[in-house]
UniProtKB/Swiss-Prot annotation:
Name of one Pfam family that matches: PTCB-BRCT
Composition skew (Low complexity), residue ranges: 986-1004
Segment forming the signal sequence: none
Protein's name according to its UniProt entry: BRCT domain-containing protein At4g02110
Source organism superkingdom: Eukaryota
Length: 1329
């Protein structure tokens, strides 16, 4: 269980710290984090402390020198903050946490202006931090006359091309920064004029000569080439008689073949952003891999040595470069199904996962450390069960306990040694890979496999892992020909079986293949692998039949060339050799290089491996994620719902759940009409589906993107077969609402914080009524004399229930709202499923109301603005419910009356409303969605009202109660059922005769009195008194019914496009048809979106330097605001963007497109002084003219915010585009997030585009330099789709009002103007979500 801050309880366990040099405020902040995480404050620096944490002290300060000499850890305060962020102790040896040698920076660094290109994620932030530590300046844009150094990962892109033409700009890789900081001087750039990508290729192709072929190298996995985060190990040096330097050759075993090749880019002609496609035919995926995950070097960690009979020395510069891990934005791919790829597991084993619906591969890198040193382990797992799992080196399954190769016996001083003796040793597990059978070269492919022992013989702690008994049994006389494996990040093993092996047996049972390889001492020419008694070994391993036959055949097939994920299903044949990319280095395996060995297979049932739940060690590119965040929540995959880890939000097949955030006493009720077995099955299903999503950021949990919440809350499956012998009438007559609900027999339950509910069971008639209500301010349903008081914000509500008659209820309520109080603006998520009694309620503040209609009971309670009138004629079996809402006593001399009458599918509704003269106060209503065909009703947005009802009969009535009343009527064999469900935002009252309630909202007080009533039904009059200038009631209810598709979309404030998952088959129409089918209360209505100052959370995203961001985030949290995950990427839940200056960044682009508040930093400072979050408008970035660089029209932030307030949608609402070619500025990921934030849609990012060659596609975004005669360009032109550059959209958002013609390609200006006009019309379109 984690705290609200996301910090595990014992992050700093064992840390005895002393703080030196801090100011009181900063020191107290760090001390609080340390103590809360289990650290112990020892006060002054003494020998008892383990960590000396300093600020503004130099590296050579006497206290720092004394601490280092005594073996203490000396770090800066950043180490505490970063460890706090990731939930575990960060690497204290990182250069980022080392005290400076001079507070003024490295001599001569003041003139440095550094820019970067090719790095992503937290790599960028750490490079910026290193520049800051050096004393230089960092510039995000490459300003030709200012920038002095460009840090390149790859020598490509616009920045590189510009820098190459300007001789004064030095092109270096990031290791230059690191080495400068280590040596505290500016080093010559000539040694670093090689890109990170070229270093990758160099290392991947580096092989030792045949003389050193038996020397196995240990390349530290999962570490950073920048030497910043995870345990650092310097370059490997091998001494050779004569001391001559020799170059790395192809075939050398010094470098880790498998890791390098596994990350080798497949192609270089397109960036990785362009490899994402939503097209079903080209489900290309991408994954971002940080270069920091593989090699990290710091002198403190010691030196990895490899000793041969002699001693050999490698050129340190080459080796240093070659240790750089592969880091490519262009190749690694992410699965759109789960979007969990590339995220580290929450453990010391950080794994890079590739997910496909078929085979899954997981490469886990283990770093285990002991006092004697640290060792690196890596295992390769291949899974096909649709689950993502990790295999920890310490936690191999019982079936193979000896698979723990090393146990921390690598000495930091002596490091890893491989000796030429009679006892063979295992190469590092990082070389374990499935391999391909190559019978054409038996001399290279056949290798002896001997007993497995510990490869390390450390002088300090030279203990050995026990020799595996199982592996001894596995050694036999059978020949196992193998060849080296090449693996790429975008490729998964495929075609691993032979024709005679059934496909099913391999794909279902060969769930894990761990290739254990061991070298045999002696001649490298000896290439026969013997495996004894494979049948017995297979029996002990509980192998599947096909796997046993595979072993019995005497040959284990391996495959080196790997298939892409979309093709990575085991086809049961090795009948084709996958084509190799030009950039895949062709490796020749030396006779004793790592890679061969035995396959261990497990049965299907044993794929669940125990793993430790710990946060990953930090590395560049991975820092700052407390858990596994969902990257790119704004998935462009239209056919796939966004992932979530909120299992309690999903309702399927009898599962009833209702999360109400902010309330710890959440309860989950399964109604008796539900099938408990189905509930269990669904729970298991959800567990499986969300296994990789357990650690989503807490802010993301609470407020996901609107489209995502739409899928989460509304994944409702109609379960008619499970209604257990209920007649259609009974099924239709019973509606269950479950929020914080328990089964009670005439016993009321009160919950002052989130509401109360009462459940009644009539045992005599076997009828059940269930009512649930959750109100933002209060909700009371109770027995005689029960009362409570609840405070929400400044509102205080006291309600008293006095008495009640079973069949007679009359309610008369009056509600007064202050003009300055917007408490009635927020809407909540509410879902009612009529057919099988399921309810899901999601969101920060859920408001749920409903009732159970029984067949013979005439009394009911209805929590609503207006109580409902229920008349039951038991003789005729008719049931009718009518609702009338009357708003009177308006503080204005004129009254507007409106009657709305519509026919939908043969249903009539009459609604009479008296309204305020202020049109807005009664015109704009909230969407209520009714899915008549599939029983699915959905709501978009963090706060919205959803009423779901499944009608079993053909006749269904959906009526537009434009003033907060909805009436549904249907006739089923003389059984008429009317239902009204209305929710009152500020207070909900459903009480008994004579009950009274006093509500105070702001300074206004309201007296509610319940009076008796004649007859057997309920009659209600709800009187609402409002200030004339009050905007709090401007959001009411609006019903949009799409009869063509039997689907009604209801959207919240954050998203205009509602996409729902329909359980039953339903007719679907085009988007234009759906839009044209929307019904509006008033064609003149203009939607106004107001944030509820008291109740609706504000989500802030901050820009600027890290220290400033951290400070602002702390202030915002103290003022009860919420902060989005700290990242340079846009977060969809953000409502406010705090920017110290306006620049054309992703955050600004997405914030403007979404219509969010873009505020100056003064807003935070003044809010801090005021002790509360102030009104935003005085602090909004808004002016006339352009910004200093001419990239932004200063009127754009306010323009698009007003568009959202007026219409409810973003700047790109309804936009449908395809992307063709490379997207560099902005990158594709940025473009996707911004377009999604602006409520647009990217249809596809790679060919084929056949499905989208129609008039509904507004633009085709083309990469610069694409020739006109390209086949797809011709297709776009033939279908009159305008072709534009990506800057067209950027400037449309950032520079509204300025000409865009210069960004139009191939003379498609007339078509572009037509699409532009469509966007302008949509901008004025009032959309009701």
């Amino acid at each position: 269980m984690q705290s609200d801050s996301g910090l595990p309880p014992k992050t700093y366990s064992g840390v005895k710290f002393a703080l030196v040099g801090f100011n009181p405020i900063h020191g107290n902040s760090l001390r609080s984090k340390l103590v809360s995480g289990g650290g112990v404050d020892v006060g002054q620096f003494t020998q008892s402390c383990t960590h000396l944490i300093v600020d503004k002290l130099l590296y050579d300060d006497p206290i720092c020198v004394a601490a280092r000499n005594s073996g203490k850890v000396v770090v800066t305060g950043s180490w505490v903050d970063h460890s706090f962020d990731i939930g575990m102790l960060d690497n204290a040896n990182s250069i980022l946490y080392r005290p400076l040698r001079d507070l003024n920076g490295i001599p001569g660094s003041k003139a440095l202006v550094v820019c970067l290109t090719g790095y992503q994620g937290h790599d960028r932030e750490d490079i910026m931090r290193m520049v800051e530590l050096m004393g230089g300046q960092f510039s995000k844009p490459l300003v030709a006359n200012r920038v002095t150094h460009l840090i390149c990962y790859k020598f490509e892109g616009e920045k590189y091309e510009l820098a190459k033409r300007i001789k004064r700009i030095k092109l270096v890789n990031h290791r230059w920064l690191e080495d400068c900081l280590k040596n505290w001087k500016l080093l010559p750039e000539v040694d670093y004029e090689i890109s990170g990508y070229e270093l990758d290729i160099m290392e991947a192709s580096a092989r030792d000569s045949e003389d050193e072929a038996e020397d196995a190298s240990v390349k530290p996995a999962n570490t950073s080439p920048l030497g910043l985060r995870v345990g650092a190990v310097p370059a490997v040096e091998i001494s050779k008689p004569g001391g001559k330097d020799f170059p790395l050759e192809e075939g050398s075993s010094l470098c880790n073949t498998s890791k390098d090749n596994w990350l080798t880019p497949k192609r270089t002609d397109r960036p990785f952003e362009a490899m994402v496609s939503t097209d079903l035919g080209v489900a290309q995926q991408h994954n971002y891999v940080s270069p920091i995950r593989v090699a990290n070097k710091t002198p403190e960690q010691g030196m990895s040595k490899m000793e041969t009979d002699g001693s050999t020395s490698i050129n340190r510069s080459i080796r240093r470069h070659s240790s750089l891990a592969t880091y490519s934005r262009k190749t690694l791919q992410r699965s759109p199904e789960t979007d969990t790829l590339g995220k580290e597991s929450s453990g010391q084993n950080r794994s890079l996962r590739m997910d496909d619906k078929g085979l899954k591969a997981s490469s886990a890198f283990n770093t285990s450390a002991s006092k004697s040193g640290s060792s690196m382990e890596r295992t390769s797992l291949f899974r096909d069960l649709g689950k993502i799992d990790m295999l920890h080196g310490e936690e191999f399954p019982p079936m193979m306990p000896q698979a723990k190769f090393t146990d921390g016996s690598v000495s930091r001083k002596d490091s890893l040694r491989v000796h030429h003796n009679s006892e063979a040793s295992i190469p590092p597990p990082s070389s374990l890979l499935l391999q391909e059978l190559r019978p054409s070269s038996p001399n290279d492919n056949l290798r002896p496999v001997m007993s497995i022992s510990d490869p390390t013989e450390s002088e300090e702690a030279g203990h050995k892992s026990p020799t595996s008994e199982l592996n001894t049994k596995l050694l036999s006389s059978n020949v196992v020909p193998m060849v080296d494996a090449l693996s790429t990040a975008e490729n998964i093993i495929s075609n691993c079986a032979w024709d005679e092996i059934p496909e099913k047996s391999l794909t279902e049972r060969m769930t894990e293949n761990v290739l254990l390889q061991e070298q045999r001492s002696g001649s490298p020419k000896q290439n026969l692998s013997v495996v004894p008694n494979l049948r017995e070994a297979a029996h002990e391993l509980d192998l599947s039949d096909s796997a046993a036959r595979l072993f019995n055949s005497g040959v284990v097939p391996m495959e080196a060339d790997i298939r892409t994920p979309e093709n990575s299903t085991m086809k049961g044949a090795l009948d084709e050799v996958p084509e190799r990319s030009v950039t895949d280095p062709v490796m020749r395996r030396s006779s004793t290089s790592p890679g061969s060995g035995l396959i261990r297979m497990k049965d299907k049932q044993e794929t669940e491996l125990t793993t430790k739940k710990t946060a990953p060690k930090k590395s560049l590119g991975t820092r700052g994620r407390k858990k596994n965040p969902i990257n790119q929540k704004g998935s462009i995959y239209l056919s796939e719902p966004s992932p979530t880890d909120e299992r309690n939000v999903c309702l399927n097949k009898g599962k009833v759940s209702a999360p109400v955030t902010g309330n710890s006493n959440q309860k989950e009720i399964s109604s008796p009409v539900l099938n408990t077995e189905v509930v269990q099955d669904m729970a298991k299903h959800i567990d499986t589906e969300t296994e990789a999503l357990q650690g989503i950021d807490s802010v993301d949990n609470k407020s996901l993107a609107p489209e995502e919440k739409d899928h989460l809350v509304l994944d409702l499956m109609v379960n008619q077969d499970k209604l257990q012998a209920k007649t259609p009438e009974a099924a239709d007559a019973e509606v269950e609402i479950t929020v914080l609900e328990r089964e009670l027999n005439d016993v009321p339950t009160e919950d002052p914080s989130d509401g109360a509910l009462q459940s009644e069971v009539d045992k005599n008639t076997s009828k059940r009524k269930r009512e649930a209500g959750v109100g933002k301010n209060s909700l009371q349903r109770g027995k005689k004399g029960s009362s409570f008081t609840a405070k929400v914000g400044k509102s205080r509500v006291k309600k008293t229930k006095i008495s009640r008659k079973e069949n007679d209820i009359k309610a008369n309520g009056t509600l007064m709202k202050d003009g300055g109080d917007n408490s009635a603006d927020g809407k909540e998520n509410l879902a009612l499923e009529h057919e099988n009694g399921k309810v899901s309620s999601g969101g920060d503040q859920s408001l749920v109301a409903g009732e159970t209609l029984t067949r013979k009971e005439a009394a009911t309670k209805d929590p609503s603005y207006a109580a409902a009138q229920l008349e039951v004629d038991t003789k005729k079996g008719k049931r009718r419910k009518q609702a009338t809402v009357e708003e009177n006593r308006l503080q204005t001399p004129s009254v507007k009356k409106a009657k709305v009458s519509k026919k939908e599918d043969g249903a009539k509704a009459n609604n009479t409303v008296k309204k305020d003269i202020w049109i807005h106060s009664a015109e704009v209503k909230e969407n209520v969605a009714v899915d008549e065909n599939c029983g699915d009703v959905s709501s978009d947005g963090a706060q919205s009202l959803v009423v779901e009802k499944s009608l079993a009969k053909k006749e269904a009535a959906a009526k537009d109660p434009s003033n907060a009343a909805m009436q549904l009527e249907f006739d089923d064999n003389k059984c008429k059922h009317g239902k009204e469900g209305i929710v009152e935002r500020s207070s909900l009252q459903s009480g008994k005769k004579g009950s009274s309630s006093r509500v105070e909202v702001g300074k206004s007080s309201v007296k509610k009195t319940k009076k008796s009533e004649k007859g057997s039904g309920t009659e209600a009059t709800d009187t609402v008194m409002k200030d004339v200038g009050d905007n709090s009631a401007k959001e009411k209810e609006n019903i949009a019914v799409d009869n063509e598709s039997r689907k009604v979309g209801s959207g919240g404030d954050q998203s205009p496009v509602a996409r729902k998952k329909v359980a039953k088959s339903a007719k679907t129409g085009t988007k234009a048809e759906k839009e044209s089918k929307q019904l509006r209360v008033n064609p003149l209505a203009s939607r106004k979106v107001f944030q509820d100052q008291e109740h609706e959370p504000k989500f802030f995203i901050v820009s600027g330097p890290r220290s400033q961001r951290n400070e602002y985030q702390q202030i915002i949290r103290r003022l009860k605001g919420k902060c989005c995950r700290d990242s340079h990427q846009w977060s969809y839940q953000a409502t406010h963007f705090i920017a110290p200056e306006i620049r054309r960044t992703e955050k600004f682009f997405a914030a403007a497109a979404s219509g969010s508040w873009i505020l100056k930093t003064d807003y935070v400072a003044d809010s801090k002084e005021a002790g509360k979050l102030l009104q935003e408008e005085p602090y909004e970035w808004h002016s006339s003219g352009l910004s200093a660089d001419g990239a932004i029209n200063l009127e754009s932030p306010k323009k698009w915010r007003l568009v959202r307030e007026k219409t409810g949608h973003g700047a790109l609402y309804g936009l449908r585009i395809v992307v063709y070619g490379d997207c560099t500025i902005p990158c594709l990921d940025t473009l996707k997030r911004a377009v999604k934030a602006g409520d647009g849609t990217i249809l596809a990012t790679a060919p084929p585009y056949t499905r989208f060659l129609n008039q509904n596609t507004d633009f085709a975004l083309i990469s610069p330099g694409m020739p006109r005669d390209d086949v797809w360009i011709q297709e776009f032109i033939r279908h009159e789709i305008p072709c534009v550059l990506s800057d067209y959209l950027v400037e449309y958002v950032c520079k509204p009002g300025y000409a865009l013609d210069k960004h139009v390609l191939y003379n498609t200006n007339s078509w572009a103007e037509k699409s532009f006009n469509k966007m302008q019309l949509r901008a004025d379109l009032c959309v009701y979500h």
